[in-house]
Amino acid sequence: MSKFRTIFITIFQGVEAKNILRTDIFKELISHADIRIVFFVRTREKEDFYQKQFGHPRVFYEVVSRIDQGFWQSFFGSLKFKLINTATIDWRRRLAFEIHKSRFRFCVGWLLNRLLAHRFVRKICRSLDMLLVKDSTFAVFFDKYRPAAVISAHPFDDIEASLLKEAKRRKIKTFGLANSWDKITGRCALRVLPDKLIVYNDLVKKDAIDYVDFPNGDIFVGGVPHYDQHINQPKLSRSSFLEHIGGDP
């Protein structure tokens, strides 16, 4: 039995790393001597980059550049964009029409969206997604580290959906972070619902209830992580700032 509680955290995208590594989230987690963190990145270059800045005896980096592809993986990866109906989604469809000038594509997209963007359809799709998509990309890491929890810092991405599925199969606690104020209404449905969702504010919480189908009690309003520095960190004087950037005082 390991003496550590291991947490998987995704930093596949820059905004994820900003929200986790460059805020007090990382500092707070690593301050607990019994916590071990495994960060998932897309490339060896990113692994080296973060290792140099955030290296620690209890921090590990694993590279996952892609997930297993197949018909059902591609099918549900495409279908998720048809499963929510918002003004932003309609605007993006109109913008695509202006670019491609395809009336057929516009009409089919509009019709599918209106037919499929319902809570009960999303629930069915998530169940079928779990059943039909066979992807064991992350299994080796679960066997290796035996995590106690998984944090997906961008659960809308397919590679992170794959990680969440593996955790769900193993009955491991999962957390998701909606890392932008407009991610829920402007992108797509979640293929996998984490056990808990962290959002920036009450407006995003309402969006998560309306469009992501999250129960009210499973959503935590945590604020914007990278804004904490404006309160917690000491302010530079004007002269110090100009000196820092090489400006003329």
Give, region by region, the residue ranges found by the protein language model.
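A short, Lys/Arg-enriched amphipathic alpha-helix followed by its capping loop at the start of a domain
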Residues: F4, D24-I35
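A short, glycine/small-residue-rich beta-strand->loop->alpha-helix junction that serves as a flexible
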Residues: T10-T23, S152
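Active-site proximal beta-strand in glycosyltransferases
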Residues: A149, A153-H154, S162-S180
